[in-house]
A protein has these predicted regions:
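Short, acidic/polar
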Residues: 144-158, 200-203, 237-243, 292-297
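Alpha-helix-loop-beta-strand connector modules within alpha/beta enzyme cores
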Residues: 179-198, 216, 223-237, 265-290
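Glycine-rich phosphate-binding active-site loops on the catalytic face of alpha/beta enzymes
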Residues: 212, 216-224, 251-265, 290-314
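Conserved Nudix-box catalytic region and its N-terminal flanking loop in Nudix hydrolases
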Residues: 23-63, 75, 195-197
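Active-site-adjacent beta-strand/loop module that shapes the phosphate/pyrophosphate-binding cleft
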Residues: 77-100
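Nudix hydrolase/Nudix homology domain
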Residues: 101-155, 161
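Hydrophobic faces of well-ordered beta-strands that scaffold small-molecule active sites
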Residues: 135-142, 166-168, 196-198, 212-214, ...
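Conserved N-terminal beta-strand and adjoining loop/helix that marks the start
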Residues: 2-25, 76
């Protein structure tokens, strides 16, 4: 057996408590524990007979004196610490009763994930804090279907509605045509603080934007993470998550969840199928296919980070 296989896996429930303004609660580890003084998300070990929701409710009551509502699945990943090999079940919590307060001598702070963070951070908390800055809505361009002018007009409407990430994915357009789209989309996205990514089909334009979305073929053939602030991947099956993790991809897009004009019912995962797929990701996953931004809450209950939708939705 390998060293990791030979070690006992400790199952841990992790609470990501999010206020309406996007601030997230962190706590530092008390004296006497490994990594004392390091900041982390609250939570703790899942005891025999508990599920993740039950364990998290108990831990957050014991640590913070609060009663939580539904804890929405976000992702699960494993981390190998010198003192323990842990499987971390991250759950986002938007609803709780009572004011979080220290019951175990730990310091607490609500922080902006995109701002200055307390230091030092527990290693397994670093990537999730960065992932929290990803918007819950990913707008996918469809210039090939709706035309350049209609796309830009609708993009302004969608960006005004709230935080979003724009993905320019135009396999039918030439590089020159995509560059013309970017020339108009970039200033609008910058004005709203919206990151913009481009499909790896037009990877030559990636230096102009904030990141790259790898196609399944490019994900399989890549030997290293592309040099970009954000790197995403389109996923068609659970077996591709291994390649995504190996490259250090930040998020995946998976679907189709529901039937659409482009994708028939026979290929749709359904919400249960999507939830089963997302549970294996180890990173944030956007639900795609037959969805609108109004499906965001349903998607998050199924384990999605958010939804990937056409920028032309009304």
């Amino acid at each position: 057996l390998s060293t990791v296989q030979a070690r006992k896996t400790t199952e841990v429930a992790v609470g990501v408590l999010l206020r309406p303004d996007g601030a997230v609660l962190l706590a530092d580890r008390p004296e006497g524990k490994p990594y004392a003084g390091y900041w982390e998300f609250p939570g703790g070990k899942i005891e025999p007979g508990e599920d993740v929701q039950q364990a998290l409710a108990r831990e957050l009551h014991e640590e913070l004196g609060i009663e939580i509502g539904a804890a929405l699945p976000w992702f699960v990943f494993e981390y190998d610490y010198p003192h323990a090999y842990v499987r971390l079940h991250f759950r986002r919590v938007f609803d709780w009763g009572g004011a979080p307060h220290s019951r175990e001598g730990q310091r607490l702070a609500f922080v902006d994930p995109a701002g200055a963070l307390p230091q030092p951070l527990l290693p397994a908390a670093i990537a999730p804090l960065r992932w929290l800055t990803l918007p819950a809505v990913c707008l996918r361009s469809a210039v090939h279907a709706y035309g350049h002018a209609a796309f830009i007009a609708n993009l302004e409407v969608q960006l005004a509605r709230g935080p979003a990430l724009l993905l320019v994915d135009e396999p039918c357009l030439s590089q020159e045509e995509v560059r013309a789209v970017l020339d108009e989309a970039l200033p609008r996205c910058r004005a709203h603080g919206a990151p913009i990514l481009i499909s790896s089909i037009h990877a030559a334009l990636a230096p102009l934007v904030d990141g790259l979305l790898l196609s399944p073929a490019d994900l399989a053939s890549a030997s290293a993470r592309p040099a970009a602030t954000w790197v995403g991947a389109c996923i068609e099956s659970a077996t591709q998550f291994g390649n995504a993790a190996r490259l250090g991809v930040d998020f995946c897009i998976a679907g189709p969840v529901l039937p659409s004009a482009e994708q028939p019912a026979a290929s749709a995962l359904g919400w249960h199928g999507f939830a089963a797929l997302a549970a294996q990701a180890g990173m944030p996953v956007y639900a795609a296919g037959g969805l609108s931004a109004f499906d965001q809450q349903r998607a998050q209950h199924a384990g999605a980070h958010g939804v990937a939708v056409n920028a032309e939705y009304r």
